């Protein structure tokens, strides 16, 4: 069995697209079509980070974006927005990116947590994602079959530069994107660690695939939330708040 199961899907047109939201009177179906959107958006998944950014960065809420997510413009970087309040995972990330791209957003960057497969990546040290192993489902509906979804190279370079300018160590490499947190098996962890994959996340492959399909730029930055090895799981979620805030600053610099 392959995904998608319908042959030649990638050559077919979709019935529903983000642009059609203007035709709906339902508030939750009204998609973005605003000339006032920022050109770049940081996607956030942890509520504490989103709340901190909104409170501390003198952010201005952008109304009229429907009910799927919240969007703010940063007071100190008005060309950059932050999206949040939409949960986690590949499907919702794809929908948010679709709607923002339809509204004119040209660049995206994830600022989030990820499990780490390599102990040499220290807590608080940003990981610049170069590509994502497509172990979720969404990416397969956007681009042709393949093992990887790739970050935009220009975004990767901007992220690396932003990390260096923040005087932080740079870790550059692939992530493993999965939608099944409780099925991250020991053989998979061993194999992907041996391949040099740095992290495991839930969104990057979907974002990269949507970006390729919609011809926009996308990157991803991660900070370590836990370590996964064949013999143990080492959770560090309680130590990520400050690291996420630093990572957000790096993402904003990369998008500015």
Placement of each model-derived feature along the sequence:
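Metabolite-binding pocket within alpha/beta catalytic cores that recognizes anionic/polar moieties
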Residues: 1-158
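His/Asp/Glu-rich mid-to-C-terminal helical/loop segments that flank catalytic regions of hydrolases
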Residues: 228-256
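Non-catalytic positions within long, well-ordered alpha-helices that form the structural scaffold/packing
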Residues: 100-102, 193, 212
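Zn-dependent metallopeptidase/amidohydrolase metal-coordination segment
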Residues: 205-239
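Generic non-transmembrane alpha-helical segments
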Residues: 158-166, 210, 250-254
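Short acidic/polar active-site loop segments enriched in Thr and Asp
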Residues: 106-107, 198, 217
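Active-site rim beta-loop-alpha module in soluble metabolic enzymes
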Residues: 146-195
């Amino acid at each position: 069995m392959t995904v998608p199961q319908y042959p030649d899907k990638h050559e077919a047109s979709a019935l529903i697209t983000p642009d059609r939201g203007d035709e709906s009177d339902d508030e939750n179906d009204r998609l973005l079509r605003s000339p006032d959107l920022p050109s770049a958006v940081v996607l956030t998944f942890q509520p504490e980070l989103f709340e901190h950014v909104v409170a501390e960065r003198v952010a201005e809420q952008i109304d009229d974006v429907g009910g799927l997510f919240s969007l703010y413009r940063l007071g100190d970087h008005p060309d950059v927005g932050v999206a949040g309040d939409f949960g986690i995972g590949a499907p919702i990330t794809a929908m948010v990116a679709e709607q923002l791209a339809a509204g004119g957003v040209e660049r995206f960057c994830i600022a989030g947590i990820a499990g780490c497969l390599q102990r040499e990546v220290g807590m608080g040290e940003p990981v610049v994602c170069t590509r994502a192993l497509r172990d979720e489902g969404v990416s397969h509906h956007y681009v042709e079959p393949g093992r990887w979804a790739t970050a935009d190279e220009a975004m990767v370079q901007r992220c690396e530069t932003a990390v260096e300018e923040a005087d932080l160590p740079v870790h550059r490499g692939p992530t493993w994107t999965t939608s099944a947190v409780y099925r991250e098996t020991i053989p998979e962890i061993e194999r992907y660690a041996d391949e040099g994959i740095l992290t495991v996340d839930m969104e990057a492959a979907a974002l990269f695939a949507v970006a390729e399909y919609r011809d926009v730029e996308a990157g991803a930055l991660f900070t370590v939330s836990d370590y996964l090895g064949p013999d143990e799981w080492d959770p560090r979620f309680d130590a990520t708040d400050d690291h996420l805030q630093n990572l957000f600053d790096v993402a904003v610099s990369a998008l500015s």
